[in-house]
Amino acid sequence: MQTTALIIFTITYIGIIFTRLPRMNIDRPSAAFFGAVAMILFGVLTFDEAIHAIDFNTIALLLGMMIIISTLEIDGFFEWIATRTMAIADTPFKLLVVLSFTTGIASAFLVNDAVVLLFTPVIIGISFSLKLNPVPFLIAEILSSNIGSAMTITGNPQNMLIGINSGISYGKFLLFLLPVSVLGMIVVVYAVKWFYPSIITAHFPEKDTKSRTDILEAKNGSHYNYHSMRFSVPIFILVIILFFLSRPLNLSIPLIALIGASLILLLGRIKPSKVIKQVDWVLLLFFASLFIVVHGIEKVGLMQQLLNHVKLTETVAGLAGIHAISLVLSQVVSNVPFTVVMLPLMKTANSETLWLALASASTLAGNATIIGAMANLIVIEIAESKGVKIKFMEFFHIGIVVTLLSMLLSFGITYLEMVIW
């Protein structure tokens, strides 16, 4: 049975790595779903075992955040933030700074994939209206969204996995990884400035902030549902506050997300069916399938054999190992499948420092290449649909520099935190 499980696992992850196999229309979710079904079909797992393998805490957190974010998206909240904040800048360099930090901070609390999905058209519209090359700003958006998302449990899907399985509180997660993200965003600003020096010399037409806001909204066809936002935004803020108070209130983070989602559907002014249609059900299927596939190799003892030979300890070597393996494997299978496989290993290590290092490293590694993270691909696809092309090597030259520098910062900061705390 070990051989069967290993073959299924290998085929599944090959499908995840090579999303377009010859003569097969396959993507990552379908490859994972095939693996999950195969584990049951070939007797590695029973149907009940497969169901119990799914981490419904993670699924619940994802679902709750998706419903909240979908409502804010329909309300036009993302465009409102992007347009208002970016209109403040009166030079291209200030625009770069505002864009980088707005994207990074928004990604920490609103899930980075959703942020870039809705910020990208606004950034392209702003660049065109101000006669600027949008590519440097789009690259800064990608890099900052990934770096910013590392600082909270709700910043990206892999952090949700880590937050649920590690038991680290929302506040502690933010406290420990905030320095990594803030310094990382500063690195992004100066790296983009270095690679695109023309940003420093360009100037905007002389207009006040209100004039720029009006122009940008007209260019982007912005539409805001302020009536709905009066309900959805306070509920979202309440959810974030409750995340920080989850320990004293004895409420789990997934439950808080579901409470917020139910309130926003019940009290919001957007038709619930419209919101639910925008939920990324494919991503939920992807997660559920990965849980089943990994549990299959756990059940037959393959994971235990690996654990017998690989030990992670709360040492310099352990921190370095997590950063190195994250950098390599996140490029191969992407950060979510990589994190799912790492969960059993991390649980045996039983170290909050190593959990935080994994959250930081697996996220930062996504900036190395244009295919390193889902947020990267979302920006590329939207940009191409609007006639803007970001070349692989153009991104790689700046992406690898930012990744290596931010990974060094991550290693140094997590090491200091390990020593001090």
Residue map of PLM features:
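Juxtamembrane and boundary regions of transmembrane helices in multi-pass small-molecule transporters
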Residues: 171-220, 368-371, 375-421
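Interfacial loop-to-helix junctions that mark the boundaries of transmembrane helices
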Residues: 1-3, 23-26, 48-58, 168-180, ...
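Hydrophobic mid-bilayer segments of alpha-helices in multi-pass membrane transport proteins
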Residues: 3-13, 23-43, 56-67, 229-239, ...
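Membrane-interface alpha-helices at helix entry/exit sites of multi-pass transporters
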Residues: 93-98, 129-140, 170-178, 350-360, ...
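Membrane-embedded alpha-helical segments and adjacent helix-loop junctions characteristic
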Residues: 48-135, 281-351
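Small-residue-rich segments of transmembrane alpha-helices in multi-pass membrane proteins
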Residues: 33-43, 62-65, 90-100, 141-152, ...
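Long, contiguous bundles of hydrophobic transmembrane helices that form the permeation core
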Residues: 185-271
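Alpha-helical transmembrane segments and, especially, the helix-loop junctions at the ends
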Residues: 107-117, 134-170, 176, 188-194, ...
